[in-house]
């Protein structure tokens, strides 16, 4: 578990119940102060906290480990309300970043000397701490903050770890190097950049069998994958070096060579490593999305395989002893794409049947639902159904034959917690699902207790429950202090509604009104889309009081904001999101323009000042919106945008656009290319990008700016801001604060822009 202040928990002193009832809408505050830039962007003053715990398996259900306020590790028992110190504060390593508890509580594995790599991955040194003597022993004797991953086996008798792209297994007696071919281009047990970012969403690619007798891991070969170089001009130095350091990153772009992937199985008893041939698709096109054990021991493992463009899927089981494979499930998704849900969970036999099953999330009915799949193959059974979607599996209770899950059953912007029995197929809400809200839950190891987390729209809180009880045992996190702060401020009013397209489909909208809103005044409006495939921005979760709140609070700005989830976004069914396949940017831009046209008709909107700003895919979408030359938007801000999908990674892009050879016209149409809208947008365009962006490369902004300049876009229509060495998040050397100050300045200028303003250059075309 990662360390941090958010994990502080004292059960002994928690309150009996929530003393401030939550309402089904966001708070607006009861004071008179307006939020300032410093109170929203620099150091937010309204910031609810939450608690995460590590449930552990002990004799008593309901035990969990947490880090106390003094830094010590403690174990708390819900049943006895007893707290025991596992590691005193003075015995915790000074630079500890994360920890993992031994299954029998005899020791702790610590990650120290942390160095970030990519989105999920990092390097660290690891130490094993005995909980009797508190002595620390290095996992590897000569480690130097260079271990990529480590974790206990389920039985606690071993630790699998990865160093220099090789897999090792540690036991109390010895450490064994399992692979020896790890190199800059060969990855064992950890994903390369693209698999980490786009497929696995994690920093490891190895999995112990439930009995810890076997270890399955993936081997990635990047030979032939093109290299992209990212320069670092400052490289964390105060004085720039004469020559920039360059990160050489194997980054496959559209239609380029992808890494190949193979499955390996280690028998711990023999030390033998076997290669498993997954023949679901051609080896050069094979994408492995998931590996999951379908057994309580080590008899078989499942591999979810996709073709290169991820519109064909096969689930293949591997008999561990014979290495024979069998395809037990297939799907065709050529009407769009197939998402990698990463949710396969083995449940075994159901009732009196001898057939074994696993659970997975699939949208084969047109909506993402829970399905029971026979391990031996055959027709699956829908465990949930309806025109709504399951968004996550929270827990599986095999003893009670229940699956706990989150779904959009009440509305796509909401999340409620349910259980469903695979014996009766009956679903039961754990919360009142008629009240608009976003919930989540964390269940104890044996499923007898859970922490129920209310995430909005009102101030979040957390309570502890026993299964089958409607009364909380106590409040874990009340965030009562947030209400004390809210008494001082007046906040923008947030509301939710739907816009109905001419086609009959609806778009979810989240609206913020300025704090002193008057329907008799006219206000500028800022659209803030993301809009990417399967994404969601319009949610009834707690909305952080950050930049959007600031621009609605500052009396010199007072912007209305609309966030609109266009076609292609998530949680409204396969048809709604699949429409954008092979044509990214077209329908999304149409929807944002249409929504802005509807906003312009409102009596309180200043139709002359309608701005749009987006980041990443939202930056791309902003660029496509300006390209439409609709005349409805008067200012565009593109932050870290894609400008041409040929510049982005293959596994994300081809999932939605297919290959360049198959869809050349689609790629041409999806690029930001037409410049008329950029010449005509009344308030101009601001483009922001980090030069050290290893995800959406600075190349995107550079190529777009070259196109706009080369086609004669006037200087008063185009402003460009790069951020030296900043990655996709733009934080390096104060970049974040500068970015938002610049954005606020442009919004201020847009609000006060007069119709006739503009240098003579903007009134005539330029010739070169």
Curated annotation (Swiss-Prot):
Residues at the active site: 616, 693, 728
Glycosylation sites noted in the Swiss-Prot or TrEMBL record: 38, 81, 104, 113, 221, 282, 468, 668
Signal peptide as annotated in the record: 1-17
Record-level GO cellular component terms: extracellular region; plasma membrane
Catalytic activity: Release of an N-terminal dipeptide, Xaa-Yaa-|-Zaa-, from a polypeptide, preferentially when Yaa is Pro, provided Zaa is neither Pro nor hydroxyproline
EC number: 3.4.14.5
GO molecular function term, any single one: aminopeptidase activity
Record's keyword annotation contains Hydrolase: yes
Name under which the protein is recorded: Probable dipeptidyl peptidase 4
């Amino acid at each position: 578990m990662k360390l941090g202040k958010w994990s502080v928990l004292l059960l002994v002193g928690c309150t009996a119940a929530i003393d401030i009832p939550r309402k089904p809408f966001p708070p607006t505050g009861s004071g008179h102060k307006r939020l300032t830039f410093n109170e929203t962007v620099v150091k937010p003053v309204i910031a609810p906290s939450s608690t995460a715990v590590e449930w552990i398996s002990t004799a008593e259900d309901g035990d969990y480990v947490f880090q106390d306020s003094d830094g010590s590790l403690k174990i708390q028992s819900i049943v006895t309300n007893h707290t025991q110190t596992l590691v005193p504060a003075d015995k915790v390593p000074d630079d500890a970043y994360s920890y993992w508890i031994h299954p029998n509580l005899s020791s702790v594995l610590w990650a120290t000397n942390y160095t970030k790599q990519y989105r999920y991955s990092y390097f660290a040194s690891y130490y094993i701490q005995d909980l009797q003597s508190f002595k620390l022993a290095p996992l590897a004797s000569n480690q130097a903050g260079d271990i990529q991953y480590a974790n206990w086996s389920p039985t606690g008798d071993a630790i699998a770890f990865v160093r220099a792209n090789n897999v090792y297994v540690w036991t109390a007696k010895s450490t064994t190097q399992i692979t020896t071919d790890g190199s800059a281009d060969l990855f064992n047990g950890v994903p390369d950049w693209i698999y980490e970012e786009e497929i696995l969403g994690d920093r490891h690619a190895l999995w112990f069998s439930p009995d810890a007798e076997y270890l399955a891991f993936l081997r990635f070969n990047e030979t032939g994958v093109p290299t992209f170089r990212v320069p670092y001009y400052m490289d964390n130095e105060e004085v720039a070096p004469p020559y920039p350091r360059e990160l050489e990153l194997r980054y496959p772009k559209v239609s380029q060579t992808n890494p190949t992937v193979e499955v390996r199985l280690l028998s711990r008893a023999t030390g033998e490593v076997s290669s498993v041939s997954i023949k679901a698709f051609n080896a050069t096109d094979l994408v492995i999305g998931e590996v999951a054990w379908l057994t309580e021991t080590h008899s078989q493992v499942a591999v979810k395989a996709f073709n290169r463009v991820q519109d064909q899927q096969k689930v293949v089981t591997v008999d561990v002893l014979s290495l024979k494979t069998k395809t037990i499930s297939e799907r065709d998704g050529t009407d769009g794409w197939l998402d990698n849900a990463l949710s396969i969970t083995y449940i075994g036999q159901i009732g009196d049947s001898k057939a074994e099953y696993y659970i997975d999330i699939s949208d084969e009915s047109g909506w993402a639902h829970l399905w029971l799949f026979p391990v031996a193959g055959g027709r699956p059974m829908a465990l949930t159904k309806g025109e709504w979607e399951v968004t996550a599996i929270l827990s599986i209770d095999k003893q009670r034959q229940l699956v706990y899950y989150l779904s959009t059953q009440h509305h796509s912007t909401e999340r409620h917690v349910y259980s469903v029995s695979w014996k009766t197929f009956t679903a039961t809400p754990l919360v009142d699902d008629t009240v608009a809200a976003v919930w989540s839950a964390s269940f104890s190891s044996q499923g007898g207790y859970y922490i129920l987390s209310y995430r909005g729209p009102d101030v979040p809180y957390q309570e502890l429950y026993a299964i089958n009880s409607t009364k909380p045992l106590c409040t874990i996190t009340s965030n009562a202090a947030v209400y004390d702060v809210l008494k001082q401020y007046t906040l923008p009013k947030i509301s939710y509604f739907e816009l109905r397209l001419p086609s009959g489909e609806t778009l979810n909208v989240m609206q913020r009104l300025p704090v002193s809103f008057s329907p008799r005044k006219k206000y500028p409006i800022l659209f803030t889309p993301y809009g990417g495939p399967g994404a969601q921005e319009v949610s009834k979760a707690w909305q952080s009081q950050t930049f959007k709140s600031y621009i609605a609070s500052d009396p010199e700005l007072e912007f209305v904001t609309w966030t609109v989830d266009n076609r292609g976004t998530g949680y409204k069914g396969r048809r709604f999101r699949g429409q954008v396949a092979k044509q990214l940017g077209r329908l999304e831009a149409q929807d944002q323009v249409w929504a802005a046209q509807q906003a312009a008709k409102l009596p309180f909107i200043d139709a002359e000042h309608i701005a749009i700003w987006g980041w990443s895919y939202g930056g791309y979408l902003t660029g496509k919106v300006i390209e439409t030359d609709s005349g409805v938007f008067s200012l565009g801000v593109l932050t870290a945008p894609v400008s041409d999908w040929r510049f982005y990674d293959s596994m994300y892009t081809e999932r939605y656009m297919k290959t360049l050879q198959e869809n050349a016209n689609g790629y041409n149409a999806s690029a930001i290319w037409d410049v008329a809208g950029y010449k005509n947008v009344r308030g101009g365009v601001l483009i922001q990008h980090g030069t050290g962006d290893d995800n959406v490369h600075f190349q995107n902004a550079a190529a777009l700016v070259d196109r706009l300049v080369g086609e004669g876009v006037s200087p008063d229509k185009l402003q460009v801001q790069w951020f030296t060495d900043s990655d996709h998040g733009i934080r390096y050397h104060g970049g974040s604060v500068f970015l938002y100050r610049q954005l606020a300045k442009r919004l201020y200028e847009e609000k006060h822009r007069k119709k006739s303003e503009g240098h003579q250059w903007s009134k005539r075309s330029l010739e070169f």
